[in-house]
């Protein structure tokens, strides 16, 4: 922290200049954006996606942010502090912040500087704790401590940011599976998906506005450098990354040389046993909307925020996995573990098997039976919720059956 403080004094307490001075992982300048754009153009990617991605990776985001605030508004948030989930879980909060600092997603400074820095706003923080999941810091950009206050999310707009399309992901994925089954009625279709690690953090704020997204925890002022979970513009500005990645992954899925590059990762994934001789595959019937795939060797990828869903035959699934990883590295940079973490979430990569039946986006999909279903955990959770919602309990009979 002393290093950052000394540099900030040297640059006359100017946060944008400090960020530009730091460079490297702090700004994402290690990425070869020109090469990425060239590959996207050669692969006939949508020009809008290319332009949005280039802006995000070189200029930063939001695309547009024009706002003003007052000293009184600043003090409303400064005096409020953080939500009780932070103050009651100091140890967990500190652990989460140390991880963010280690990955160079934040700049830590003494909190007393908050009154002296230009264009600074303080946003309350919360800690989301769920069973069997890592604790997640919540940047509560929509919260206001009183009706006179104006939050950062109230100063921003969706209209000027990239289009959000991930709401159609699951539907698109299921339609792909249906058409796949039309084209391969007697072959195993395996399901898999991978995640981007710290996805939103890879999209960097424009240095001139980074301090508007600041927050204070304990004695430290934190300046975030990448997208915060809770900002209304963060998901939209990750969309060009996701869309460019899925486009490149499909383009790379034709190649058969990438598996050798990533076999040290892919070979660790457990793949379900082949079907037995008596296995029956449920057929999919062609119609005017679904006629099958033009080329079953090409893989279609669909991303729901940071989660990339795909499916392939047993002969091609590993090539699809390699294509997905390569596309991620082309967009966000190749791993250099001595200086930064792998953008691929390896812990999630190995925690489940590649199979004809897999839970994707919380829904169990089975490509042999061509069915989708709630997981037992979700079904029981719903039953428990409904038991408190309706006193007479009549609504439960359908779900129990």
Language-model regions, residue ranges each:
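Hydrophobic side chains in beta-strands
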Residues: 65, 127-128, 139, 217, ...
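Surface-exposed beta-strand-to-loop junctions
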Residues: 72-80, 215-227, 301-305
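Conserved aromatic-histidine-acidic binding/catalytic patches
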Residues: 81-88, 226-237, 296, 300, ...
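Polymerase palm active-site segment centered on the conserved acidic dipeptide of motif C
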Residues: 164-172, 257-272, 279-296, 300-302, ...
């Amino acid at each position: 922290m002393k290093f950052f403080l000394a540099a900030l004094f040297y640059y006359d307490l100017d946060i944008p200049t400090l960020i530009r001075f730091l460079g490297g992982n702090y700004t994402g300048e290690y990425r070869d954006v020109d090469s990425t754009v060239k590959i996207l153009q050669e692969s006939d990617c949508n020009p809008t996606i290319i332009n949005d991605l280039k802006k995000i990776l070189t200029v930063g985001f939001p695309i547009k942010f024009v706002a003003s605030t007052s000293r009184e508004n600043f003090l409303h948030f400064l005096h409020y502090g953080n939500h009780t989930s932070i103050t009651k879980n100091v140890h967990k909060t500190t652990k989460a912040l140390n991880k963010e600092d280690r990955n160079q997603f934040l700049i830590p400074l003494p909190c007393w500087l908050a009154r002296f820095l230009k264009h600074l706003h303080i946003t309350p923080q919360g800690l989301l704790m769920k069973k069997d999941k890592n604790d997640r810091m919540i940047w509560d950009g929509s919260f206001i401590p009183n009706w006179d206050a104006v939050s950062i999310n109230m100063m921003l707009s969706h209209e000027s940011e990239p289009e959000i399309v991930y709401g159609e992901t699951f539907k698109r994925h299921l339609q792909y599976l249906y058409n796949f089954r039309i084209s391969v009625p007697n072959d195993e279709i395996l399901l898999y998906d991978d995640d981007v690690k710290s996805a939103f953090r890879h999209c960097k704020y424009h240095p001139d506005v980074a301090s508007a997204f600041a927050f204070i925890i304990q004695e430290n002022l934190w300046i975030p450098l990448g997208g915060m979970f809770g900002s209304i513009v963060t998901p939209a500005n990750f969309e060009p990354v996701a869309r460019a990645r899925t486009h490149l992954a499909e383009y790379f899925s034709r190649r058969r040389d990438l598996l050798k590059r990533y076999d040290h990762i892919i070979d660790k994934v457990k793949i379900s046993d082949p079907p037995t001789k008596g296995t029956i595959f449920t057929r999919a019937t062609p119609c005017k909307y679904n006629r099958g795939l033009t080329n079953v060797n090409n893989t279609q990828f669909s991303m729901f925020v940071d989660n990339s869903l795909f499916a392939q035959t047993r002969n091609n699934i590993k090539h699809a996995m390699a294509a997905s990883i390569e596309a991620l590295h082309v967009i966000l940079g190749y791993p250099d573990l001595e200086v930064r973490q792998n953008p691929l979430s390896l812990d999630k990569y190995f925690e489940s098997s590649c199979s004809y039946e897999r839970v994707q986006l919380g829904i169990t999909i089975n490509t042999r039976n061509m069915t989708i279903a709630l997981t037992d955990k979700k079904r029981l959770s719903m039953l428990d919720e409904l038991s408190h919602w309706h006193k007479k309990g009549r609504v439960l009979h359908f779900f129990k059956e």
